[in-house]
């Protein structure tokens, strides 16, 4: 995990533009991981352009808003796809028009579509992975309410409010860390 998280952050460092995708027919984890990563990167790198794209799902509109991105923005962008096991399920097929592609997921690896693929099937959700990614870089202090809220919604969604068998002690301990700043 340490090595791959460092590789992912090294790639993010190289790009001025990052576009984050997720799967079609999104659930709370798709939205939560996508928007959680977006909000975190915006706080960590305020000079970068960070976008979250895909078809909006009206029942999940309360989680957050998605961005409209022109085709030409993809030219020199890093694309990160969250919570999507295989390429045909990626919402917005422009994902392959970026300069580089990273996959971050918790579903069993059925399609290694990214140049960098991080899949942790032991994680309850991709939102949990994004939380671990943030804490790996000791960035807990830049997690604000917007980041914490969407990641929490993603974790709650994929664990069935912590009732499903994918809920681990690690999952339960995530929110016992120091409180996010307001």
Language-model segments: which ranges?
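Short beta-strand segments
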Residues: 54, 80-83, 154
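Short, glycine/acidic-enriched loop or turn micro-motifs at the edges of active sites
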Residues: 26, 84-86, 108, 161, ...
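Generic enzyme active-site microenvironment
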Residues: 21, 25, 81, 103, ...
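A structured phosphate/pyrophosphate-recognition subdomain
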Residues: 2-21, 36-42, 111-181
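Structural signal for conserved beta-strand scaffold positions within catalytic alpha/beta enzyme cores
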Residues: 52, 81, 103, 118-120, ...
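Anionic-ligand anchoring segments at beta-strand to alpha-helix junctions in alpha/beta enzyme folds, i.e.
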Residues: 19-72
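Residues at the starts of beta-strands that form the adenosine-phosphate
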Residues: 17, 48-49, 78, 100
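Active-site cofactor/cluster-binding pocket
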Residues: 62-116
